[in-house]
């Protein structure tokens, strides 16, 4: 991975484990629109991909359906206040980001999460200082697609894809980066199953975030 100068990093399932906040807020939003989810039902698969589409899938309606929008608004009502911080850092994240920055890499957050939430989470965990710029989606839905988000970052920052690396935990991180000719690293501790990651076929897989340092040396 010699030419790498810029590292695009996913948030949920890569830097932080947002399971409690996201799933509890999703249950809240779905319940508000009359779709209660049983406690024993696992909805961890919603962590990472564009949320509105996942909520629509649970309710078995089209993503353009008003119910999907209403469930998303209900989700945000709880997430923006409480869910945001029902979240924890994965091991060695701070030390690894600090080392990468000190080694001269430019780090960019690349999350499908709305930018306004992503920045608050980075500030909460004191991670913002390590990023050249944090990129996320808009509350209106633009750039929730990982490929679109990556295209936007490349254009805004005038980056050469050959000098970039994408680090994430789900197939859309890998596929979105590949669409733009960017090498990929999948973290195995996030929310992408082994099967999902095998099918996405990232160039590298790591078992802990700090293994990124070994890849880059």
Locate the predicted segments by residue:
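Short, acidic loop-to-helix structural element flanking the phosphoryl-transfer center
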Residues: 81-109, 115-119, 144-147
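Conserved Lys-Pro-Asp/Glu-containing loop-to-beta segment of HAD-superfamily phosphomonoesterases
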Residues: 6, 145-174
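Conserved H-loop
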Residues: 36, 128-132, 160
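Metal-dependent phosphoesterase signature
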Residues: 57-95
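Helix-loop "lid/cap" segments that line or gate small-molecule binding pockets
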Residues: 29-30, 50-64, 121, 153-154
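Active-site neighborhood of HAD-like aspartate-dependent phosphohydrolases
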Residues: 1-45
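Acidic, Mg2+-coordinating phosphoryl-transfer loop and its flanking beta/alpha structural elements
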Residues: 165-204
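A short, structured active-site edge motif that brings together acidic residues
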Residues: 46, 128-143
